[in-house]
Amino acid sequence: MIDAVIDIGSKTIRLSVYKVIGDEVKNLFNEKSSASLASFIEKGMMNEHGIQKLINTLKEFKNLISNFEDISKTYAIATASIRNSCNRREIIERVRTEVGIDIELISGEEEAKLSFLGSGIDSQSGILTDIGGGSSEIVVFEQGKVVKTSSLNIGSLVAFDNFARGLFITKDEKKLLEDDIKLMIASNNLNRVQHDLVCAVGGSARACLKLYNEYYDKEAGNVIITMDGLKNLINTLINMENRAKMKLILKVKADRIHTLIPGMIILYRIAKYFYADIIRVSMTGIREGFVYNKILERG
């Protein structure tokens, strides 16, 4: 059985194709588009430009999917980008009519649980975070099971839109962003229990890891970020001359030139809240979790 999963995020729309054999999932194909849908939100609604960007991207993905002869099912899931839009019903109907794809809205709690399920984390207890473009999910798990989830209305793209006046966030803007993140975490009544390790999933975390490995000359397969190293890297980037900063980020992750640093700040503040020493980045997440969940539903 082969399934296609389209993940409609606030910054990136991703297509992944998986081959499912029993309870094993093999990734066959990946494609992405940096649609930045959160940038098209005006007065709580996605404007026509954003809706058209979404529709055009989904048409392109549908065309790619048609190249696979044995696709059993195509799923499209949407997180904060559409979930938080007042005109989400209109968006879903437009996509159904113009593209022929049904979008399934994923709540913040569902998003957190699916990210945990797909992370492949082997620790029995700890914290998992998924930093998206429009929201950040936090999962507290014990004995291998989710015991609490929390969704923060801040992601890398929203942070950039709300706090940065230029291409890069400044020292003063960083302080305002950090204060906002701390207030959001505190308002979610998360117990501040120490966890030495935080697991991170999602595009922001992977981009952060890639920059971290480049800056500290780590091996390509490294998935560990130390808190001291991340703090130093963030401060170095904040104080770095813009041209040098641009050159470094363009080399590593060009499509995240404006959102990478805000995403790193969010990741750091969440991990620091739980007194973590290290962050381990998983290469899998919500899409894999969604497929695993479908396997469980099928029995």
Regions found by a protein language model. Give the residues of each.
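Short glycine-aspartate micro-motif
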Residues: 3-7, 126-130, 198
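Helical "lid/coupling" subdomains associated with nucleotide-phosphate turnover
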Residues: 17, 40-63, 67-71, 79-125, ...
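A structural signal for short, well-ordered beta-strand segments
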Residues: 31-35
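Acidic, divalent-metal-coordinating active-site segment for phosphoryl/phosphodiester hydrolysis
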Residues: 134-140
